Design a protein with these regions (language model features):
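Structured mid-domain segments that build the active-site/substrate or prosthetic-cofactor binding neighborhood
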Residues: 1-141, 214-333
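Internal maturation/activation junctions in enzymes
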Residues: 53-60, 81-86, 118-214
Length: 333
């Protein structure tokens, strides 16, 4: 949606007019105007997506009941009704998954810092740089990459993430499904950050065209959280998780030695407890070093039993695609 907001509704790679015309990006003079354009793009894309999802859910409820799923919900058993029909309250299984929130926050923070505050370039120059994947604009690219980033306990970017998510959530939660059930929202990108990134152009946060978006759902973009795990958890906790009714996914990879003693394990447990007290949601760890993962890529026959946490599920590392392996390796704390 941010790409559409910064390109007057046009998808960069295809050149198609996918969203409404929300204004020449060169005319934006402050962050509020960009966020308003983003919201318009989000709302325009949500309506047809919701219509499709309603049709999908209606078919499930009337033609393809799911007794196995129903067996896990007491209300379905009590009512004798399907999960996708009227079996559960107050939701009917429809969730809007948000992917790339940290990229959005990083991008808006970079625009605020580099364009509006430092005036290192104007919006027209930024728009042209994005269109050409920063060809010939390496200095501007570096300045955008040096701007504040999500995951470092910095209010100037963390509160942008909170604000964008709040506005999107408030819009989604006004809607209802075909059987009058409330819609839910969650930062649960799973592993779609890789294919989604492939169809997107460059972004103001310094991500180049075709590169993956931030993974998991709410995890900082790889390599940008440079202030330690406590800063990561503080950034994530600033987001109002009460609006994330379907939760969020935070992936963290730390060295195995971080839990090599009982004292270290207790410290990690205390860290997680504080995160939960701050109303953080799902956090999952990989306790494996970079050297081990890189060696597993080179010699998969030696690591057939190497399990890693992907996104709410675990898998054998050597069975994952190279792109997903690289994404897991790039995770940091």
């Amino acid at each position: 949606m941010l790409e559409l907001a910064l390109n007057n509704g046009v998808h960069r790679q295809s050149g198609r007019q996918l969203g409404p015309r929300t204004g020449d990006p060169g005319s934006f003079s402050n962050l509020t105007e960009i966020e308003d354009a983003f919201e318009q793009q989000f709302e325009a894309m949500y309506r047809p997506a919701m219509a499709f999802k309603n049709a999908d859910m209606y078919l499930f409820a009337t033609q393809m009941p799911c007794p196995l799923i129903c067996s896990f919900y007491g209300s379905c058993l009590e009512r004798g009704d399907d999960f996708f029909n009227f079996g559960i309250e107050p939701y009917a299984g429809h969730v809007t998954g948000i992917c790339g929130l940290p990229n959005i926050a990083d991008s808006l923070a970079a625009i605020q810092k580099v364009i509006f505050t430092d005036k290192a370039a104007d919006m027209a120059e930024l728009s042209q740089a994005l269109a050409t994947n920063f060809e010939g604009r390496k200095e501007l690219l570096q300045k955008l990459r040096d701007a504040p980033k999500f995951g470092n306990d910095l209010d100037e970017v963390d509160l942008i993430a909170r604000r964008v998510l709040l506005r999107s959530s408030q819009f989604v939660c006004k809607h209802h499904t075909w059987n009058d059930r409330k819609c839910a929202i969650g930062c649960i990108g799973m592993t779609v950050n890789i294919p989604y990134g492939e169809i997107l152009g460059a972004m103001p946060d310094g991500r180049l065209a075709g590169e993956p978006l931030s993974e998991g759902g709410i995890s900082p973009y790889p390599g940008r959280n440079v202030s330690g795990i406590t800063a990561v958890l503080n950034s994530v906790a600033k987001i109002d998780h009460d609006w994330l009714e379907n939760g969020s996914i935070l992936n963290v990879r730390i060295a195995a030695g971080a839990c090599s003693t009982l004292d270290k394990l207790k410290k990690l447990a205390a860290l997680v407890r504080v995160f939960c007290k701050k109303k953080g949601s799902l956090i999952q760890f990989n306790f494996v070093g970079t050297e081990t993962l890189l060696d597993a890529q080179k010699h998969p026959e030696r690591y057939k039993d190497l399990l890693v946490r992907v996104a709410t599920y675990s898998s054998y590392f050597v069975e994952l695609s190279t792109a997903l392996q690289d994404n897991i390796i790039s995770r940091t704390a």
